[in-house]
Amino acid sequence: MSNNHVGLSRRHFLKCAVVAGISCYIAPLYSRAFDVLFEEKILQAPDWNPVDKKIKFRIDGYAKVQGEKVFARDIRARDIPHWPKQQGHAFLLRVTQADKIYEGFNLERLNDGLMPDRIVTASDLEKDGVAFPEFYGEDLLLPTGKTPAYLGQAVALLIYHDFAKFSFAKETLKFHDDVIQYGAYTGPLQRDPWGTYRGVRIGGETPFSPDTYSSMKDMPISPIGMKKHLPIWPEGREGGKLDQEGMYYADELAKQLENPPEDWLVIKRKYFSQSIDTSALEPDNANGWYDAKTQSFHLVIPTQSPQEVAASLPEMLAKSKFPIKQIFLHPCFTVGYGSKDHTPFPYYGAMATLYGDGVPIRLANDRYEQFQSTIKRHAFDMDYTLAVNKKTHKIEALSASFIGDGGGRCNFTPSVVMVAATGAQAIYYIPRSDLSAVGIASRAVDAGSARGYGTLQAMAATDMIMEEAAKLLKADPIEFRLNNIIKSGMKNTQGAIPGGAIRADEVLTRCAEHPMWKERAKRKADFEAKNAGKLFGTGISCVQKDFGTGAESSFARVELTPEGKIAIYHSGAEIGTGMSTSQAVVCAKWLGKPAEEAHFSVVDWSVLPMISTGNPFAMAQDEQERLATNPLWTPNYCSPASASNSAYYFTHSTEEAARLVFEYGLWPAAMSIWQEGIGGGQAAPLVVRREDARWVANGLTADGLEVLSLQRLIDRTFEMGGLTGAVCHVFNRWEWAEADFKINDETRRLPVDGLSLRFANKDYQVWHRQKAYYPDTQRNNAGVTYYSAVATLSELAIDKATGHVELLDHHTVVECGNLIVPQLVSGQIQGGLAMGIGHALHEYLPLYEDGPGNGTWNFNRYHLPLANDVAVWKQTSEILPGLSDTDPPKGVAEVVMIPVVSSIVNAIADATGHHFLSLPVRPNDILEVLS
């Protein structure tokens, strides 16, 4: 234990970081605006039923339906008391060509009194030392004399102190190609890929035997160089270095697929999955004020990754010539579907703030600008070769290559293409595989952490080729899938064993029993008899998707108040998923009711000052062991809200903090009450075990003892000096880090790597771990170990005259452990299905000159699915019950979006007899086939 006392006052500014002499603060100022920003008014006390242990509404539910849930986009300078009342505005000029030298811009159209108060260009940034944080690459603004890296790249910022001038000027310049000046033609920039991945697995004699070669056992393969911007893989050599040996097995597999045995069916297909916009309700925006007199910098932003901004913004500003002593950062509620995770937009907002000349500056995309600049889902070209045994109908091998278009900036492209390759196996056991991926740099708009993260593209393709294989083998599509399903204890294509029971077979079996599937032939005949001009099709698809990144981490602080309330503080951000509600409810398992006071996107963790150095994905084992001797070191400081990580990973930190408060606070208090009186009180005649404790309607009981109210327990806990607050930091590299802590003379090995405790009303104390047990760095090669399985049945009709697809009905079966808040899971299912339907049939962005980078795209051209596109009144879903009440909850936000894509394409194949390979499948594509 440390004697390191940490004082904490919620009524004062809270320092969260100091970088190069700049302090970064979170500022809970209790004004109208900051009530909103810091959730004092948005989040209501949970409407909790202690009998059925269910919550009636989201804790932000009333605010949502009453229009009181204010986003960063709604905040103006006048809302923040200490800011100047004048609100300035700015917009960016962006290129619409990326094959010619940029030579400047022409603002002659603004000569009628609409010229900006300030123009910022790359030369200003260079002079003042203002540049992107390293993650985002170069050229915050493109200098003259260079070819743009991508369509829509920003070249200048125009700042106005008057809204009317700003508004007229922006409209005056919009859609005019002569504003940006271009010089000589150069062609698009040619660059090496942003990232590559290759994983080879040659399994043993059985799925449970040791592998001959795999990423987990040996290593994934990296290129030895680049030639013409394509990877050069090592030369295959049996018995050579590990990567050479891996390439030897890859070469041998390729030879066999080219010259297969007679009893193999080999299918080769090329698939394409399009670029899409995540279409977040709130476009990117920022509002900031730089006060040169006090050298303070204020910024209001929506972000899925507030900790990333809190860490990177001070570094960016510290390198500039602007004198800044302190930053006040205000991350807000938002929605992004990945587009606000590590987005460059906050740094454009910071740039605008610096050049506001003392006036708060708001930089906010309209929807045209949002299409032109926000992070997109990667387009993928996928080349598949699948071998299936004609006799056994078992998969023999899969070779697949994936090319993801990362656009003009790297962002998360290296990990997206890796996740596509590692996720391609979907629900299937594949004994031999060679899966490679390349994330190319192109002139397209940036692609990044969009929902699906490569797996939507790859898993849909895998299930589409499996559907075609079943048809060619004249096998029942569900039976064929069940015959090839991965079972518990088998290995994935990286050679790792997934965690827990694999239940994809149960999900598929439920679909096989559904009338939509059992009666599909009759339903088809009946429909087509009644609708002469239409075709009817039924489709099935099942996938299981990982959740998490392989370096998940979070902070949670759970504490009791003397007034009988429970409070939670969490590093995770609420991005519309209901995470704020679910984490409040998680507290009820150990503390009897949900947290009444809830704070999210918390960036101040001075109560547990963990530090992180190095790259958790690329760290050597000896480096990790050396760094872990520091009891406050962790491989990863904090994760953004992404990768479906709240239900499982964020819950872990919350639950561990609540568990400690129960074990060292409420439980000893309960025992002290039950043991009061002569002879050991009411507890003495009974055998009382902590594991028998149960929360019932009126409080806590165990083994037939008196029910004690929570208030009574909290009162006794404070009287006894028991534990009233715990802060936990957790880390997961496809398994949880653990550490030894000595608490009350007892050494405990806990699944946390950082801990701070508060007893009664004392200050928090950092509890230094005695020893840490981090998952080996080799476990990075596992790729994934946590899965949720989802299957979707779909019925659709196709108009033979127009090619229009009408989705008639769909049914989805989900396996996601025990639910924290069932209504939130239902909402995720419905929303994910709509997204998948859009990807399969409607949503499409051209990648290059005709695409969103030209600044002309909006929802008049981009078809988001509407209610009549998604069978809104007929769709159904079911959720498999957990195996027991100990099953952890699983992430589902992304996986529910995926199988409906391939289910629809498979249903179209059932209706037309043609297996489409490119997404989306649009009416003209169908008409070509029907004609």
PLM regions: where:
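Phosphate/diphosphate-binding loops
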Residues: V359-I403, H652, E656-Q675
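Thiamine diphosphate
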Residues: F328, F333-A364, Q372, M579-C587
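Flexible, low-hydrophobicity surface segments
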Residues: Y30-M219
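Surface-exposed intrinsically disordered loops and tails
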Residues: V51, Y185-L257, Q624-E625, G677-P685, ...
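Aromatic/His-enriched, Gly/Pro-containing loop or helix-boundary segments
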Residues: E126-A156, D341-Y348, D357-V359, N365-T374, ...
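Helix-loop-helix junctions that connect adjacent transmembrane helices in secondary transporters/permeases
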Residues: S209-L317, I485-E563, Q778, T792, ...
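C-terminal catalytic domains of large/alpha subunits in multi-subunit enzymes
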Residues: C16, F34, S123, K319-Q326, ...
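N-terminal secretory signal peptides
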Residues: M1-L8, H12, F34-D35
